[in-house]
Amino acid sequence: MKMMVVVVVMMLSWLILKPPSTWAINTITFDVGNATINKYATFMKSIHNQAKDPTLKCYGIPMLPNTNLTPKYLLVTLQDSSLKTITLMLKRNNLYVMGYADTYNGKCRYHIFKDISNTTERNDVMTTLCPNPSSRVGKNINYDSSYPALEKKVGRPRSQVQLGIQILNSGIGKIYGVDSFTEKTEAEFLLVAIQMVSEAARFKYIENQVKTNFNRAFYPNAKVLNLEESWGKISTAIHNAKNGALTSPLELKNANGSKWIVLRVDDIEPDVGLLKYVNGTCQATYQSAMFPHL
């Protein structure tokens, strides 16, 4: 009996001391160098499955969890055609990229965005990306993770930054293991990676843009850019809809930049992959045959 008590105490101590960031994080790997449309689709599905809260859904669209659900983070490893890898760390509740890791001189090198470095989550990023304290080294990202901050470092708006599998593949090699690279090079890689990973997971429309233009570089159109900036209000509008009708019209943009007025969930449902967490109950399904696939 005494031995059992000791074992229980040891297990509880381990659980208390073990950093929450290490709980059940599975790394999702995407082989960018050998990518196909089907492999990219599978990659997106893996992110959806690991990120979503399995108990939350509005009108058939899965929702991300609140900040209390563990694991709190996702790791996404991107591998180029030369087998070089960069691992992105994403917050599970919103898919924001917090930082990334590569290998430098045989050690795990972690990079943390400036706006994350000033928070209590900094240690989570460091220990999750590079768990071994004796084999890690840090290299700061001296700017924030917002689009305006990234665009400022790149020197042009993201509407003028090409996306595409080959662009993503080549970007990995410009960072991995490199002693010194410019902030412009880093920010351009991150702009591409964030849109092709996080934004594509949030929006089926962006995922489909990548698949449609799979073998060529492309510029994000006005609809892509607008969706990226409207995820929160889109999620709230869908969450608050009454039997498919939005409580107020949602003004968005079409691909050509013209005005797109959304009145019903089914107008935008095909474009959405994941909803941002919104507190409170919502209709899990449409109370008609509008969504036969559910």
Curated annotation (Swiss-Prot):
Its EC number is 3.2.2.22. Keywords: Antiviral defense, Cell wall, Disulfide bond, Hydrolase, Plant defense, Protein synthesis inhibitor, Secreted, Signal, Toxin. Monomer. This is Antiviral protein alpha. It comes from the Eukaryota. GO terms for biological process: defense response to virus; negative regulation of translation. Residues 1-24 form the signal peptide. The keyword Cell division does not apply. GO terms for cellular component: extracellular region. GO terms for molecular function: rRNA N-glycosylase activity; toxin activity. PANTHER family: PTHR33453, RIBOSOME-INACTIVATING PROTEIN. Gene3D superfamilies: Ricin (A subunit), domain 1, Ricin (A Subunit), domain 2. It catalyses: Endohydrolysis of the N-glycosidic bond at one specific adenosine on the 28S rRNA. Disulfide bonds join 58-282, 108-130. Residues 286-294 form a propeptide. Belongs to the ribosome-inactivating protein family. Type 1 RIP subfamily.
